[in-house]
Regions:
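PRPP-dependent phosphoribosyltransferase catalytic core
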Residues: 2-10, 133-177
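Short, well-ordered alpha-helices that flank and scaffold nucleotide-derived cofactor binding pockets
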Residues: 50, 54, 76-80, 133, ...
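Short acidic, glycine/proline-enriched helix-loop-strand junctions
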Residues: 59, 74-87, 154-170
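Short glycine-rich phosphate-binding loop at a beta-alpha junction
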Residues: 59-70, 146
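Short, glycine/charge-rich flexible loops or terminal/linker lids adjacent to PRPP-binding catalytic cores
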Residues: 72-116, 124-129
Length: 177
């Protein structure tokens, strides 16, 4: 098996939790995909970095990140995955800090840079579009949005004028919306 198949197995074995849950979007579901169980796993995290780099290999960007907490381990996995180009990672806070440098985006400066916004999974696109807005406010050029598992956010992200890619769909994981 390759990285893509190996990561899918980690997701289905570790991250898919069956039972009634309320998603951050407010919608209810009979299962939950808890990707932190994968993105923070010692064997799966390197796969996340390689799969997400491969998914976006034809997009030109030099920094990756998104809204904390879902995007953080993805960005770090991509940063450490190596590849044909170096990447910086950044973290977008939900709100600016009231102390210190009062930055909303932590890490290397992204002003004037081409960046990729990532998220672990997305149903409505709200979290990643919040990150995109913050990135644009500081002058970053967002080249696209990439998620590990798409729960339906593609239309909303594309409607915001951004290319969108997902490493896996719900069907890829044997789940129905």
């Amino acid at each position: 098996m390759g990285d893509h198949d190996d990561l899918r197995k980690f997701i289905t074995d570790l991250a898919v939790v069956h039972g009634r849950v309320v998603l951050s979007s407010g919608r209810e579901a009979d299962w939950y995909v808890d990707l932190r169980r994968v993105t923070l796993h010692h064997e799966a995290a390197p796969l996340v970095g390689r799969v997400m780099r491969a998914l976006t290999a034809d997009w030109a960007y030099d920094a990756v990140g998104g809204l904390t907490l879902g995007a953080d381990p993805i960005a770090l996995s991509m940063l450490h995955a190596g590849g044909d180009r170096p990447l910086d990672a950044f973290v977008v806070r939900k709100a600016g800090k009231a102390h210190g440098l009062q930055r909303r985006i932590e890490g290397p400066d992204v002003s004037g840079r081409r960046v990729l916004a990532v998220e672990d999974t997305s149903t409505t696109g709200q979290s990643v579009l919040t990150a995109v807005e913050a990135l644009r406010e500081v002058g970053a050029e967002v080249v696209g949005v990439a998620v590990i598992v798409d729960r339906g956010a593609g239309d909303a992200v594309r409607a915001a004028g951004l290319p969108y890619r997902a490493a896996y769909t719900l069907a890829d994981l044997g789940l129905v919306a």
